[in-house]
Amino acid sequence: MFNCHAHPGLYTKNALVCTASIDEISRLSPFPYRSLGSLPGYKTDMSVIENWAKTETFIGEVGVDKRFDNKERQFSILSDILSIAEKHHNIVIFHHVGWTEEFLNTVFSFNLCGFIVHSFNMSYEIYKGIGRHNGLVSLSPKAEKTKFFSTLRERGIIYPFLTETDTETGIEEREILKTWNDKLSSIFHIDMEKEVEDTFFSYISSCPLLGQK
C-alpha cells in the first residue's frame, strides 16, 4: 500500500515523503522516495533546490498559495523552480491554493518530465486537462467533500489518480490510507491499492534519470 503524499515521520519505503521547506532536507535522507519542497511562507534558496535536483527524482511540494501575499514573487519562485525541474528532468509535486488559471498556465508552459498535483480539489475539467498534459492528481480523504469528487462519481474516471494522506508517516498514516483506499475501491469498483501502486510506479519509470540518480 503506497502513500503518494506524506511528510517525514516514521521510516517507511511505502510513501513519497515530501517537505514544505528546504530546512527539512535532513529529515528526508532515510526515505527511498523523497521530495524536497519550498512553499510560500518558507525560506527559499535556489542553489539548495538545484543541488537536490541534480541527484534526486522528485521536487516538491512547490506551488502558489493565495493565503500568502506577494503573488508576483510566488509565481517568480515557482517559475525558477520549474526551470530547474525541466533542466534536470525531475518530477514535480505541486501544492495549489488559488490563482488557478495562472498556476496552470505556468505549469503547462514548462516541458516537465512529470508532475503530480497533490490534495487535488479543482474541477473535473481541470482534472482532465492535467491528464492531457501527462500529469497526475492525488486525492486525500478531504477530497470526498469536494464538488470535484461528486462529479468524479457521476462521470467516472477518465485518467487514473493517486491517493495520499498528507500526514506524517506512521501507524495512523497507514490506517488513514487503508480506510481511504477501501472506500474508493467500494465507490469505483476497483482495487484502489493496486491501481495506485501500478499507476505511480509506471508513471515514475518514465523519468529518464530514475535509477541513475
What residue spans do the PLM features occupy?
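Mid-domain alpha/beta scaffold segments of enzyme catalytic cores
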Residues: M1-K213
